[in-house]
Amino acid sequence: MEERFYQPPLMVDYRGKGCLMVSYFFFDSNHKRIVILLSLMHNIERMVLMNLIIEGHSITPRPDTSLFTMVQELGLFSGKLSSDPIVAKIAGRVFTLNYVPVRSKDLAPERGSIRKAMAASDGTVELIRYDSPIGRDAYTRTAQFVMFYSLYRLWPRAKAQMACTIGASLYVKVTNCPEFDVEKFKEEVQKTANENFPLHRRRITIQEAMDYYNATAQEDKARLLSYRKKRTLDVYEKDDFCDYFYGEMAPTTGFLRSWDILPAEEGFIFVFPDMNNPDRVSTYKEMPNFFNVYNEGKRWGALMECETIADLNELTESGKIRELIRVNEALHEKRFSAVADMVCERGARVVLLAGPSSSGKTTSANRLATQLRTHGKKPILMSLDDYYIDRDKILPGPDGKVDLEHINTLDTALFSEQLQQLLLGQEVEIPTFNFKKGKREWIGHKMRLEDSSIIIMEGIHALNPQLLPENLDANLIFRIYASPLIPLNMDDHNRINTSFLRLLRRTVRDFESRGSSVENTLDMWPSVRRGEEKWIFPYQENADVIFNTSTLYELAVIKKFIYPLLLKVEPGDECYDQVRSMVKVLNYITEADVEDEIPPTSIVREFIGGNTFYRKD
């Protein structure tokens, strides 16, 4: 499979001549890097006239002047996280503010200068702040560097492992450091932030990086780098500390503002800024149910010797991934059986199943229904989607836009009334929502619960308390929150976000089942995420059970389906930079051709196809 990349043009001063460089490069089937370089020579005056537009200001960049300096000179920094730019976006590409658009030194032989291209047909530079997901990701990477560097300064032999996010906080595990002291560590982090030193990258060879990480007992990083196709790596350095991440960071450590560090078992909690008011620290909320389920996944990963991407790759290459699949699927079945036991022991008549997009809710509902049947129950699968009100009756919000994720798009009064009637043994006619027409229809779908009937109601708002009638017997309701809480890390300092896995799942599913393009899925994703933050995540701790729908093996399987789709995205597309980031991670993963081992009722089948729950024959 040919892997092709396009690098936008870079204007440089090459030996006294303005030089516009454009390059294409790709990997052939043997992963050999082939570069085609086109160099168009112009005089130096052309370079000088290349202007940038930064928030309405036209700037002629001076040689060797960074975007950071330009933004400073424009007076766009206030010292507040809410208003200060963190990174920049140019022609769909995200850049560090330390990026230098025009350099005076001889850069022609340096491939890195081509990769870091200054590409904008009109020169527009979009400044990205904390209110953007891109800005928050850059802040997170900056926080990681500051934390790990500070830990290294205090206790050089200590090991830190990125664990999981808990609301607006991050749990980091610390090992090999019996003397670890949270307060002392917090002071050191503040000291590093106050030093406000620049965060510059340096390009080194993969061998240099592997030698460094092996010498500093960071075998997790060295093992991962052995799967990297490129011969070089961009690292961040300070003194004798060296680390790398998968994206841009803030220009200096001083951008780490509005944070806190709290003690935690075997480590600490880093509390991020408030998303709605970044100039203050968010309130840390303990989530014991979520935390316990995540730790259970980590324990299983350790037992299966699959805690990192390098572990997964080795299992794929050895063929042992088949055993991993069998154990994962057996574990899921065991959990569904246990949940069915709990539902029946309580005497619940209604199961409410919620979770964020691409969590595998539909397959989970069907597999739970199968287990309930082994108890002699008659499960009835329903969807909250059928209780949507007509689209033309949805009122816009204060911003004038219609929020289709809002709970007010559901007829909660009708749902509450019909639920009460069903539990009283009455017959009701259930509505059917016609998504093509955007209207509710009544097609004679009547329902009455038998003594052995159990409703399984799936929907993003299923855990919202507004759904249920008052004074309802709590024992009649059983709540489940489903989410793929993947326990795999790239390495100790780089975790794989649950949202990343869900985006991979959704991209493949939307293409396979709906014919939706990568561009369309990625364009909708920010809106989906905002809806989840507002309407799903706040209620997850209300669940009686949190069900982890991830599997340790699925990244190796799903790569086969998503990789070709991502490579079709062109450089000029708005989502190109996001696709590059996704490809960057997938490049480390060894593809596994083991579909014949995946059961037809697997949650993974909901996304790659072949799930027999959806057969019509």
Roles of regions detected by a PLM:
Residues K361:
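Conserved lysine of the Walker
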Residues S364, L368:
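Hydrophobic positions on the alpha1 helix immediately C-terminal to the Walker A/P-loop
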Residues S358:
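Walker A (P-loop) phosphate-binding loop of P-loop NTPases
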Residues I86-V87, A91, V102-E110, K116-A138, ...:
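Auxiliary tRNA-acceptor-end handling modules of aminoacyl-tRNA synthetases
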Residues L353:
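Hydrophobic anchor at the beta1->P-loop junction of P-loop NTPases
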Residues I394-F435:
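Conserved nucleotide-sensing/catalytic segment adjacent to the nucleotide-binding pocket
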Residues H375-R391:
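Short beta-strand-centered segment that lines the nucleotide-binding/catalytic pocket of NTP-utilizing
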Residues L468-D617:
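Conserved NTP phosphate-binding and transfer environment spanning the P-loop NTPase/kinase superfamily
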